[in-house]
Amino acid sequence: MMKRVCFYLFSALLIIFISSCSSTRSMKKGVSIGNLSESEYMEELISRSPGWDAITAKMSLAVDLNGKGPTKVNGTLRMKRDEVIQLSIAPFLGIEVARAEISPDGVLVMDRMNKRYVQVPFDELKNLAKADLDFHTLQALFMNEIFLPGKKVLTVCDISSFAVRPENENALIEVKNGKHFAYRFRTNTNDGLLKESHIGLSGTRYGINWRYDKFRPLEQKQFPASMTVSFEGAKQPVTAVFELSRLSTNKDWESHTEVPQ
């Protein structure tokens, strides 16, 4: 029973996502964030981005699909930059019963016990979502990074693509000309940490909100040990909470999953 629940939880989450789809400087004229101008603040955020090549963690995942209470499972989260994001569910004695794998080619959801799987290429996902949905967007969300749709790497040359405005102790960053989607990021001006990412379908109430909490040290940087994903616009609230432990940058693991024949 548990392995079926895990498999359907992974599938439901992916379908819902597709459907909803301390430095000091002199004050400059124009918009200012603390002691920095708008462009200086963005430059600092980009230059200080950790850019980890890999991240692994033990994971506790709580999924609530109808507002009646979460279903909790344990497992592992593994990521290799520009290659793969793996979510492995192993509720009993470390035995994997389900896996979700996101790669630049698409999304694979697998029921290990019954050798069943769902595999969808990103080209098909883009058509379903009517937007530039790709691997690098999902990678940025999982890796706690600001991103620009359609770009693999964010550089200081992209600063003009963002609008920044102060919001109490935070800075609200929005992507200009986001086509079908509105992209918004909230960072803390004291430490520059990304606290929230939001993707909304323009002109509708549908969207996804990704909140980051409980930051922990990871190679002299900070990574969120808690991520809360909320899918907006559905009749019933849908949330997924990732609680992470034993954070590491270990790269010694198999990047891709063999599909059973």
Regions found by a protein language model. Give the residues of each.
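Bacterial N-terminal signal peptides that target proteins for export
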Residues: M1-F10
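C-terminal motif of bacterial Sec signal peptides marking the signal peptidase cleavage site
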Residues: F17-S20
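An acidic-aromatic
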Residues: V84-H136
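Bacterial signal peptide processing site
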Residues: S22-R25
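A short, Trp-centered hydrophobic/proline-enriched beta-strand micro-motif
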Residues: I46-N66
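Gly/Pro-enriched, hydrophobic low-complexity segments
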Residues: L154-P260
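Post-signal peptide N-terminal segment of mature Sec-exported envelope proteins
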Residues: K29-G51
